[in-house]
Amino acid sequence: MNKTVLITGCSSGYGLATARHFHAQGWSVIATMRTPRDGILPRSERLRVLPLDVTRPDSIAAALDASGPIDVLVNNAGIGLAGAFEATPMAQARRVFETNTFGVMAMTQAVLPRFRAQRSGVVVNVTSSVALAPMPLVAVYTASKMAIEGFTGSLAHELQAFNVRVKLVEPGYAPTTRFAQNTELRVDELIPEAYAPFAQPIFAAFAQPALVTTESDVAEAVWRAANDESAQLRFPAGADAVALARVA
């Protein structure tokens, strides 16, 4: 039977690769993004692009009304933020949480009545390898993702009785994604002069990482998580994330 997945944050990066991967596997795909873009996904009767802003309840309701029945929700939409916490405006910290944390919770809560009623469904929450090992200069981002790690673990137990599975995909560092671009503030604005000697070698190391994650690594991990019927909760994605998971 043909299955349907709804994926958030499909305009680029992990979400775009995941939408392409599920479509290539024969699934029906509902690819959502704040501002739909033409030409980035294949034209197909099994693929629809819908507008969705996960921070707006009315947008969530409209997208789910338009989507029809779904079998899997992939909460991928997120924004990055790198810099010294001391220099991070709290308004920006709240914006990160609105998307990365409360947006995931809101999407999940909106689909649960459907999944519970049909006694099937999978929620896949995409977090980050920062949840596997603390890293400097991403304190707010880490906090937003760690919250979803705890949320997902608890929810997985809560929904077992309804045959609804909840999974985590933990991507590593992907230099080709728009992590630091998905924010209103540039990194250099968040590095005060006093932090520069500390920050410079860290950013230099990120420029030449020994191990990295690719978009296809994440798409394949999401695919495995969505189809996994075991009790496995965490699916690290990418060589660096897998290495961290071994020692976490």
Q: What role is predicted for each listed range?
A:
Residues 11, 19:
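N-terminal Rossmann NAD(P)H-binding glycine-rich loop of SDR-like oxidoreductase domains
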Residues 51-62, 90-91:
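The beta1-alpha1 cofactor-binding region of Rossmann-like NAD(H)/NADP(H)-dependent oxidoreductases
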Residues 161-231:
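SDR active-site lid
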